[in-house]
């Protein structure tokens, strides 16, 4: 029981590190993959979850690296991505970002692209990379 509680606390901390609208991002991932994002992607590989480093381990990890880069690009243009709420709808299993505000719309697009990337790479998802030890991530981080 203590192990389960500790795991829940660790996942919550990891999820708090994510920028943007966490609840909408979770819904997007759930819609596109059918999987529970907290257990599947929060600590996957070298880039999913908090603070990525090294060389991404596989296509799913590259999705997370691209997502990080997408947010960094927005931040360099003056968008504040941390906890930025956006409006999104789902029409016929499609994600539709609806904000007129450019930063909100772009954060939504970053999340949408990542969710679709996860879905496109479900077949190569590697369970051994779940809860991967980030200290094992070596090599130079790929440029954005």
From Swiss-Prot:
Keywords: Antimicrobial, Bacteriolytic enzyme, Calcium, Cell membrane, Disulfide bond, Hydrolase, Inflammatory response, Lipid degradation, Lipid metabolism, Membrane, Metal-binding, Mitochondrion, Mitochondrion outer membrane, Phospholipid metabolism, Secreted, Signal. It catalyses: a 1,2-diacyl-sn-glycero-3-phosphoethanolamine + H2O = a 1-acyl-sn-glycero-3-phosphoethanolamine + a fatty acid + H(+); 1-hexadecanoyl-2-(9Z-octadecenoyl)-sn-glycero-3-phosphoethanolamine + H2O = 1-hexadecanoyl-sn-glycero-3-phosphoethanolamine + (9Z)-octadecenoate + H(+); 1-hexadecanoyl-2-(9Z,12Z-octadecadienoyl)-sn-glycero-3-phosphoethanolamine + H2O = 1-hexadecanoyl-sn-glycero-3-phosphoethanolamine + (9Z,12Z)-octadecadienoate + H(+); 1-hexadecanoyl-2-(5Z,8Z,11Z,14Z-eicosatetraenoyl)-sn-glycero-3-phosphoethanolamine + H2O = 1-hexadecanoyl-sn-glycero-3-phosphoethanolamine + (5Z,8Z,11Z,14Z)-eicosatetraenoate + H(+). It is found in: Secreted; Cell membrane; Mitochondrion outer membrane. Its main location: secreted. One of its GO terms (biological process) is regulation of neutrophil activation. Binds 1 Ca(2+) ion per subunit. Residues 1-20 form the signal peptide. It is a peripheral membrane protein. Disulfide bonds join 46-137, 48-64, 63-117, 69-144, 70-110, 79-103, 97-108. Its EC number is 3.1.1.4. One of its GO terms (cellular component) is mitochondrial outer membrane. One of its GO terms (molecular function) is calcium ion binding. Gene3D superfamilies: Phospholipase A2 domain. The active site is at residues 67, 111. Its cofactor is Ca(2+). Ca(2+) binds at residues 47, 49, 51, 68. Belongs to the phospholipase A2 family. Group II phospholipase A2 is found in many cells and also extracellularly. The membrane-bound and secreted forms are identical and are encoded by a single gene. Secretory calcium-dependent phospholipase A2 that primarily targets extracellular phospholipids with implications in host antimicrobial defense, inflammatory response and tissue regeneration. Hydrolyzes the ester bond of the fatty acyl group attached at sn-2 position of phospholipids (phospholipase A2 activity) with preference for phosphatidylethanolamines and phosphatidylglycerols over phosphatidylcholines. Contributes to lipid remodeling of cellular membranes and generation of lipid mediators involved in pathogen clearance. PANTHER family: PHOSPHOLIPASE A2 FAMILY MEMBER (PTHR11716), PHOSPHOLIPASE A2, MEMBRANE ASSOCIATED (PTHR11716:SF9). This is Phospholipase A2, membrane associated. It comes from Bos taurus.
């Amino acid at each position: 029981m203590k192990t389960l509680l500790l795991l829940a606390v660790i996942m919550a901390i990891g999820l708090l590190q994510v920028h943007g609208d966490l609840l909408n991002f979770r819904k997007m991932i759930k819609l596109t993959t059918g999987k529970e994002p907290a257990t599947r992607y929060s600590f996957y590989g070298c880039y999913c979850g908090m603070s990525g480093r090294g060389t991404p381990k596989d296509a799913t990890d590259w999705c997370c690296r691209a997502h990080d880069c997408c947010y960094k690009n927005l931040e360099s243009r003056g968008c504040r991505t941390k906890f930025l709420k956006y409006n999104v709808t789902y029409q016929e299993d499609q994600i539709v970002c609806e904000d007129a505000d450019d930063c909100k719309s772009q954060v939504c697009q970053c999340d949408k692209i990542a969710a679709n990337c996860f879905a496109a790479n479900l077949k190569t998802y590697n369970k051994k990379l779940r809860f991967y030890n980030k200290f094992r991530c070596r090599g130079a981080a790929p440029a954005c």
